[in-house]
Amino acid sequence: MLRWLTAGESHGPELIAVLEGLPAGVPVSLDGIRADLARRKLGYGRGARMAFEQDELSLSTGVVHGRTLGSPIAVRIGNTEWPKWVDIMSPEPVDPEKLQGARAAALTRPRPGHADLVGMQKYDFDEARPVLERASARETAARVALGAVARAFLAELGITLVSHTLSIGPVRVPEGAPLPTPADVDALDADPLRCFHPETSARMVAEVDDTKSSGDTVGGVVEVLAYDLPPGLGSHVHWDRRLDSKLAAALMGIQAIKGVEVGDGFLTTTRRGSEAHDELFSTDAGIGRSTDRAGGTEGGMSTGTVLRVRAGMKPIATVPRALRTIDTATGGAAPANHQRSDVCAVPAAGVVAEAMVALTLADAVLEKFGGDSVGETLRNLRGYLDAIPEGRRTGADLVDEADAAPPAAPEA
């Protein structure tokens, strides 16, 4: 199984992440991780911090000459802005004279929608700085770095991930629009909002512009697709072993995510049973499904079709036209603290969601197929697939009902 942990504050010296349980032999490069960290900064509507904040990446342990060793992997992401925060975020006591000025002022006006107030209550802080530093989405850089390593492992098994933006505010990709494939990743990353539907992307840009001009923020929905998963990841046996349960928890753990769907999700609740499920048909290639409404999972297990999971991101809570709050130092009404923020970070949320799905799937693969090396894991996977009896093997991802063999007539 995989175990992983991140540490670090938004304006601290560095973020640290440790990943344990990955087999030996996974090809890992700093350039590959840097590429995903750069993708995390993409998207129309991002704030100024993305322009000047650089990720100083290093691998401390677990990788030698571009291959994992099977031992814990430690990633460090240095903060180029640290010199500005040395005194304010120092782990050692600092002369109060050095803590003068606006940057060091106590943050006593908690922001609605953030962890500020509840964190102050829970941890007995008299200001929000100790809370917001860790609650910040800056922490997701560490998760994206680990996700890049997990993606490299999955790629060795032929599994690839793609994310794209489905909606920004009320602007949404039309139902039934083509899904992006791994071949479309470069085109997606070149789009200002990582949307695969050009006409919708242009309307999304206009929505972000309108939101910015009104001093507001906007959210949206992203979708992650996983191609070429084997059937049988996860289990129906216990709630906490269900693959969709693990994916939902992983995605809900991303800052500002307020909802998750698997497959057609809540749309399925509007249909009758005869139109809500994926019928099975026999083909020359094996068993196929007429649709993928379930989104690649049934009974808590992967089906072998394309996995589809969606995450809904709320509008960023740090609103330029500051929301109303209470100054906890005086008890009086006040505008909320406002720091640099994005108008829209939905495209970046897609990249973070990719990382979380990659880590979750890598863990599920290792739970099912084990292996102390990539080669052993791959042999176990192939052996499992070869052992599935011919009459139970799945073939093409989707089958056109008109081309499928009719179901056998029941015996008299």
From Swiss-Prot:
Complex and partners: Homotetramer.
Known cofactor(s): FMNH2
EC number(s) per entry: 4.2.3.5
Catalytic EC class: lyase
Keywords noted in UniProt: Amino-acid biosynthesis, Aromatic amino acid biosynthesis, FAD, Flavoprotein, FMN, Lyase, NADP
GO biological process: amino acid biosynthetic process; aromatic amino acid family biosynthetic process; chorismate biosynthetic process
Gene this protein is translated from: aroC
UniProt-annotated binding residues for FMN: 134-136, 255-256, 299, 314-318, 340
Protein name according to UniProt: Chorismate synthase
Pfam families according to UniProt: Chorismate_synt
Pathway note: Metabolic intermediate biosynthesis; chorismate biosynthesis; chorismate from D-erythrose 4-phosphate and phosphoenolpyruvate: step 7/7
